Amino acid sequence: VERFFDLAEEVRLAQAYSSSVNGKTDSKVMVGKYGNFVRSGSYSVNEVLKALKMPKRAKDILNAYWCYLGAHCDDLSFAHYASMVNRYISRGVLMPKMRSHEISLAFIERIRELGGDVLMNTEAVRILTDPSDGGVAGVILDDGTQIQTRHVVAKCAPHLVFGKMMDKVSEEVVRATNARKFSGRGFTMFLGLDKPAEELGIENHNYFLYDTMDTARQYDMMRTIEGNNVQATVCLNRAYPECSPKGTCMLYFTTLYMSDDWANVTPE
């Protein structure tokens, strides 16, 4: 286990170095200072744990966080996973007091500080392209306003972007879009309870509940709603006791589903 965290810390330091030089890393520095990161960088979590001769019980515990990244540990990049687990364990749980809404407000505040504009309740209905090079030229809003830009970040499905928001899309892009399959997607239920966490026996901030510690098998079981009993359960009060009135607590339950089985759910 110590070797895992030593390697995970080297991964973190290598990532910090790469970030400090905007990704223009010196290969001699990478090999000389972060050789273990270079050697493990192309391997999955389970491949590296096997090389470390990790005991099964320790492996099961370390692999518990896989659902945060949505891929099982036979496929999941060790570098990404080790970086996350290392930070989670060494730095502990951090949560904005106003939760995710506070993060959104911070984004808005910083964008405006830098001279940007934030438009609320405004839909971008079309993405314009430059006929000379096919690149992005702007967007049209739902009120007809046209904004010139060479860069667009669209937080929606590629099928919507290329199928409805753009006029000219290359055949290569269409084929690539149609070839994509759904990855893991989340479903979350929030509960406000009229009992404190202590009275309900909830002692920790985060719980992982799995059918099996074989992550590849669990991933496959999560392709159907009926076979999916996985949940990551969080009690917000254990990170921030004042997040709900005294004598109450807040819980949320999250699961992932790995196919489009939810499309088979009827209104009934």
Language model segments and positions:
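FAD-dependent oxidoreductase catalytic-site/capping-region signature
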Residues: A232-E268
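Mid-domain catalytic core of redox enzymes
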Residues: V125-S244
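General beta-strand structural signal in soluble alpha/beta enzymes
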Residues: D60-I61, M120, A154
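Helical element adjacent to the flavin cofactor pocket in flavoenzyme catalytic cores
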Residues: A82-D142, R150
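Rossmann-like flavin
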Residues: V1-L76
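Generic structural signal for well-ordered, non-membrane alpha-helical segments
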Residues: V1-A8, V38-V45, A58-K59, P96-S100, ...
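Residues forming anionic-ligand binding surfaces in small-molecule and nucleic-acid pockets
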Residues: L76-Y88, K246-T248, F253-L256
